[in-house]
Amino acid sequence: MVLNFHHSCAHNNTFKQKVFHLLIASALFLSCQAAIAQQVYTLKFATLMPTGTAWSKLMDDWVKEIEEKSNGRIKVKMYSGGVMGDEPDVLRKIRKGQLHGGLFTGYGIGRIYSPARVLEMPFLFKSVDESDHVREQIMPDIEAGFRKNGFELLGWPEVGFIHFFSTKRITSIDDIRNLRIWLWQGDPLGEAFFKAAEVDPIPLSIMDVYTQLSAKHGSIDTVYTSTFGAIALQWYSKLKYATHIPLTNAIGGVIVSNRFYNKLPADLQQLLKTTGKKMGDDIRLNAREENRKSIGLLEKNGIEFMFDWDEVDMEEMLKIRDDAATYLEQTDYIPASMFNKTKKMLTEYRNRPENQSNKKLDMAPPE
């Protein structure tokens, strides 16, 4: 009986030890899960867009949505109005880990994945319907290109239709060649277009444009931007004229670094992707509306829209576009394969019966 008693005690002790170890392991697991759930990730995000604009309000809504839906696990520090510098400066800070993301124009996008800028090639698309169609088709390629180069693409907003704005009248392409036109410093797409057009532009950071327009003997008298951008950046107050038919429909991107994105738990990654896409879509639709409204506001403030390209001008512009495309292909900034893919998509889209009536190239902002 004694032997049986000791055997029973030993068995009970072993069982108690197993239960004890299991409880300890469970407690550790739960505490680790709680720590993960409570970890706060701070997203430092920068944009050139000034505060108080329609875009900045949409970004503020995005920040609020992220922080609420993450239950405070993501906090966003927003740096608006170019306080972190021009887009190349912001990208350098992201790569160094000082920032984590930003809202960029095509200029900044080109420094991450340049083939995406086929979407803002001058005079390539006849309408936003065409650019929307092609964008949807090549978006998987663009997202993969961003990811390969260290970034996650969250959303795809739109800057909108780009016009020349000047202190001088513009009535011909020759007039354009005689202007002191700003070039966003370091922009290969702008460089290629102006080279093909035989224009000698003045390269400046976007941060210096307003100063030079304001100066009595400033280095530039002409810029290019959207109608909404001319107001948001206050450039319109120093200008008098604008071209009616725009050059292109400029793109934008909402991005975060893979370094930041990959640290997030899966649910927070999905939250960023879902809300970022929605913000990009909201800004794109808002930009189209704001650009339409801005035409009237600019006219009320003394901006005269002029120069509806005639057929000869348009043929020359298309030749300039093709020459610029050749330069960009030679440097592999936008590879020939991307141009060919885009042109094939456009041809197929234009050949649809419902699109046969849209034969004329008309990049005027939609009514």
Task: List each model region and its residues.
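Short regulatory "switch" loops immediately downstream of catalytic or recognition motifs
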Residues: 1-5, 212-215
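Bacterial N-terminal signal peptides that target proteins for export
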Residues: 2-23
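Bacterial N-terminal signal peptides
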Residues: 21-31
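Short linear Ser/Thr-Pro motifs
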Residues: 31-32, 70
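Sec/Tat signal peptide C-region and signal peptidase I cleavage site
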Residues: 33-37
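N-terminal secretory/targeting leader peptides
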Residues: 38-130, 146-367
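A gly/proline- and charged-residue-enriched helix-loop-helix capping module
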Residues: 129-143
